[in-house]
């Protein structure tokens, strides 16, 4: 409670470092409709067999359902319209990741506990960038999980997700280049809503906050006890 109440995907992942005890952590999104054991063993395997790997991302085909029709391609809209262009522009070393925003990934605790976590949907791209900067491209891997199907979100939700991801990339550029771009930009988003034939604006604050590395939290040291390697 003393660290404040926040919500978001990254917040949940950051807190999972505190409540878990293993040397390897694997995260899998909960909205997968074709869940299969390969989503687990496919991610754990490379980390067990390749000691040089610090972090592994899943990739796959991403079908999209439109009405009653499922198209073999077309999923991963935020990746293709926001994340991939940003990575090619500012972090080209990461441009070869097939699914940089994949919700199926894992890493070694002694690496993850050293990293800040974006509280919202910027967490995936933020972790990729930080591990690249701290450990180099050879520490990162990706594994083929064949195909992933999930509940597709409406376009307005994807727009808000992109807003968070863009903020995270700006923050990482600020940290890398000693800039202060993020503190000067607008952190509210005007969303275009419709009701019958009427259009109106709805303003929503979407500030992608960041948690410090878990290793900086005193209670984490206490909880990990003998399992914690200082």
What are these regions (language model features)?
Residues 1, 30-33, 53, 58-61, ...:
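Short, ordered loop/turn segments at secondary-structure junctions
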Residues 1-21:
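Active-site-proximal specificity loops/subdomain of glycosyltransferases
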Residues 20, 74-168:
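Conserved catalytic loops of nucleotide-sugar-dependent glycosyltransferases that act on lipid-linked
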Residues 22, 50-54, 137:
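Short, high-confidence coil segments that cap the C-terminus of an alpha-helix
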Residues 25:
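Short aromatic/hydrophobic "clamp" motif used to bind/position activated sugar donors
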Residues 29-46:
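Acidic donor-binding/catalytic loop of UDP-sugar-dependent glycosyltransferases
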Residues 54-74:
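Short beta-strand-to-loop element that shapes/binds the nucleotide-sugar donor at the catalytic cleft/hinge
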Residues 153-230:
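Terminal low-complexity segments of carbohydrate-biosynthetic enzymes
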């Amino acid at each position: 409670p003393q660290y404040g109440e926040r919500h978001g995907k990254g917040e949940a992942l950051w807190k999972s470092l505190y409540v878990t005890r293993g040397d390897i952590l694997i995260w899998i999104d909960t909205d997968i409709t074709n869940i299969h054991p390969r989503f687990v063993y496919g991610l754990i395997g490379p980390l067990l067999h390749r000691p040089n790997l610090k972090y592994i991302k899943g990739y796959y085909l991403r079908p999209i359902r439109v009405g009653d029709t499922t198209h073999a391609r077309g999923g991963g809209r935020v990746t293709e319209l926001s994340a991939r262009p940003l990575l090619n522009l500012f972090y080209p070393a990461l441009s070869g990741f097939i699914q940089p925003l994949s919700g199926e990934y894992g890493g070694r605790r002694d690496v993850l506990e050293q990293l800040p976590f974006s509280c919202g949907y910027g967490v995936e791209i933020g972790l990729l960038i930080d591990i690249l900067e701290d450990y180099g491209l050879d520490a990162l891997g990706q594994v083929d999980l064949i195909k992933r199907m999930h509940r597709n979100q409406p376009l307005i939700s994807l727009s808000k997700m992109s807003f968070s991801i863009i903020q995270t990339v700006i923050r990482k550029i600020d940290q890398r280049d000693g800039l202060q771009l993020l503190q000067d930009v607008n952190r509210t988003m005007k969303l275009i809503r419709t009701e019958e034939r009427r259009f109106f604006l709805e303003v929503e604050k979407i500030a992608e906050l960041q948690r410090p590395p878990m290793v900086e939290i005193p209670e984490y040291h206490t909880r990990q006890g003998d399992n914690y390697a200082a």
